[in-house]
Regions:
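Terminal amphipathic alpha-helical/low-complexity segments used for targeting or macromolecular assembly
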Residues: 1-77
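Structural signal for interior beta-strand "rungs" in well-ordered beta-sheet cores
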Residues: 72, 76-97
């Protein structure tokens, strides 16, 4: 699977919205969608190491999969303790991290 950064960003948006999922429950069993797993790995290959320091939390990671930012409108609770959510992760409303 070959994609560019724009295609990968669109792919992440589909993951974040829940339109596509890495795994699905089919007939009571969980099935991994291997093509999605491969696309996520491709995103790491596409990325460039970037300084993503946030306040007092310094870190360096690939620019294709940054930490997600949430607002009150997302209805997701992010509590203190070192949790982070990367780009491409789906969090339903009312989730507590």
């Amino acid at each position: 699977m070959i994609m560019d950064k724009k295609q990968f960003a669109d792919f992440c948006a589909d993951l974040e919205s829940g339109r596509i999922r890495v795994a699905e429950k089919i007939d009571g069993n969980w099935k991994v969608n291997a093509w999605i797993k491969e696309a996520i790995l491709e995103g790491f290959k596409l990325g460039t190491l970037t300084d993503m320091t946030e306040g007092q939390f310094p870190f360096i990671d690939k620019d294709t999969i940054p930490v997600r930012k949430f607002t009150v409108e997302d209805k997701v609770r992010i509590v203190p303790g070192g949790s982070s959510v990367r780009r491409g992760a789906y969090l339903a409303p009312s989730v507590i991290m």
